[in-house]
Amino acid sequence: MPFFLKELSLTISLHPSYFGPRMQDYLKAKLLADVEGTCSGQYGYIICVLDSNTIDIDKGRVVPGQGFAEFEVKYRAVLWRPFRGEVVDAIVTTVNKMGFFANIGPLNVFVSSHLVPPDMKFDPTANPPNYSGEDQVIEKGSNVRLKIVGTRTDATEIFAIATMKEDYLGVL
């Protein structure tokens, strides 16, 4: 999986009750809470903020008429963005006749029944429902290796379509 280091910035508004000697610590804590684990459509998933002790916080400015202060906070972050053609390991979350859904960390992936190997058939009578072949079973909780064939990016989420119809892909 390709991870990236990126310099990012965020404007944080601060209520006057937080002004004081611990203001820098509060801004750092707010940055970590607001950014880590989120998804930016432009950059991908923000996994973590690096060097949290050396985050660059500018002097800030008071917003006229409100009393709030705005601070521009610059930080380095580890990002993950899925790419078409990337081979990944996933955990199956839902199985139905149309295909199955799986999670790759925070990323939701759909594998259509047309992108499952032809020897694997959907068995709706099984408990839980699954796709089964000669020696493989795909059911909720199964670990599978997939290849991403397409991604769709929204403002706060990334969704992917994947396949299992290639060599070395399938149930692990």
UniProtKB/Swiss-Prot annotation:
A GO CC term attached to the entry: cytosol
Molecular function as annotated in GO: single-stranded DNA binding; single-stranded RNA binding; translation initiation factor binding
BP-aspect Gene Ontology terms: nuclear-transcribed mRNA catabolic process; positive regulation of nuclear-transcribed mRNA poly(A) tail shortening; positive regulation of translational initiation; regulation of septum digestion after cytokinesis; transcription initiation at RNA polymerase II promoter
Record's keyword annotation contains Transmembrane helix: no
Location in the cell: Nucleus
Effect listed in the UniProt record for changing residue 166 to A: Reduced interaction with seb1
Matching Pfam families: S1, SHS2_Rpb7-N
Outcome (variant: residue 167 to A): Reduced interaction with seb1
Gene3D superfamilies, A to Z: Nucleic acid-binding proteins, RNA polymerase Rpb7-like, N-terminal domain
Main location: nucleus
Key words of the record: DNA-directed RNA polymerase, Nucleus, Transcription
SUPFAM superfamilies given in the database record: N-terminal, heterodimerisation domain of RBP7 (RpoE) (SSF88798), Nucleic acid-binding proteins (SSF50249)
Keyword Magnesium: no
Quaternary context: Component of the RNA polymerase II (Pol II) complex consisting of 12 subunits. RPB4 and RPB7 form a subcomplex that protrudes from the 10-subunit Pol II core complex. Interacts with seb1.
Described function: DNA-dependent RNA polymerase catalyzes the transcription of DNA into RNA using the four ribonucleoside triphosphates as substrates. Component of RNA polymerase II which synthesizes mRNA precursors and many functional non-coding RNAs. Pol II is the central component of the basal RNA polymerase II transcription machinery. It is composed of mobile elements that move relative to each other. RPB7 is part of a subcomplex with RPB4 that binds to a pocket formed by RPB1, RPB2 and RPB6 at the base of the clamp element.
Family: Belongs to the eukaryotic RPB7/RPC8 RNA polymerase subunit family.
Protein name: DNA-directed RNA polymerase II subunit rpb7
